[in-house]
Amino acid sequence: MRILHLIYSLNVGGAERMVITLANYQVQSNQVGLCIINNLYSQKLLNELDSRIQVFRINRKKASRNILDVFQLNRYVFKFHPDILHIHDSDAILYIPIRSFYHTILTIHAMDLPLKGYKLYNQTVAISKAVADNTENRGLCRPEVIYNGISTSAIQRTKKNIPNAEQNFRIVQVGRLEHGIKGQHLILKALHRLSSSHISVDFIGDGSSYNYLKEVTRQLKLEKQVNFLGNRDIEWIYHHLCDYHLLVQPSISEGFGLTIAEGMAAGVPVLVSDLPAPLEIIDKGKQGYYFRHNDVDDLCRMLRYIIKHYEEALQLSDKAQTFVTVNFDSKLIAQQYINLYNEYIYKTHTK
């Protein structure tokens, strides 16, 4: 089977991570290509791709309307001639007039995304039930749900230990520094209110809110407790998540929450906002803790509870490791996509 993935950019994010994981799995038994439309991509992420994957880079400037970019896009699609054209940004299909020659699939990676061209796709997939509900509530056909996947076997497991009074309780948050979406400022405000010098927070990721979050850290006099580590490659993350006592994901908007699943796979207790998608991952509180989203008081309450009852949190994290392996392992997720592709091919051949 020939599978071509199409995405606007390849920087750090859940959609990009899924595309890489999916392509690397699929190339084991298929011919796989990846087309990146814009000139926004991370060489580190490209280096994670299997060498057998054919990469096409159009290098379009963001928001450009250069007709030559459209021509180049269609030339690459025609050249690869996929059985499956798997697109990860909805409106990209509008720029592929030769789309009718291929079976097109859209994966919707977040809530409230503009979905121009949605009805042109042969099949649509959402990365969570929450995203599927959000899509249906906008008057569009409900997409099938296939969760994002993680390589659970590649994630180093934590050594269970309860920090003593002299040790720092280490919190980690992983994601783009976009506080209006990911809510990192809530952690800073909660840390300030807790008034404990034995709690530290590491932010892993980069983004447009970096300067704002650094300034909030300075204003709250948290410089000795807060570290901004910048982007880290997936190998580093998978190796070091286990160094932390708690992963906090205080999202204000979230379509899935890949790093929540990664923390669970590492055996790290997790605390997430009570949005529908994160609650799916922690099985409505059976596999992790949650607080009212955008509520610093409730975040403080739950942080105090987890620190005080950390032995309970570790027991919960043991269950969560099994849960995430059974439900979100990348091999399982990738196979679900292969099954979806094969379903189309079978129907085509039996017409």
Task: Place the predicted regions along the sequence by residue.
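N-terminal strand-loop element at the rim of the active site
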Residues: H5-L68, G207-Y212
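Active-site donor-binding acidic/aromatic loop of nucleotide-activated sugar
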Residues: S209-Y212, E223-D233, H240, Y289-Y290
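Short hydrophobic beta-strand element within catalytic cores of glycosyltransferases
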Residues: P269-V272
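Carbohydrate-associated surface elements
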Residues: A130, G149
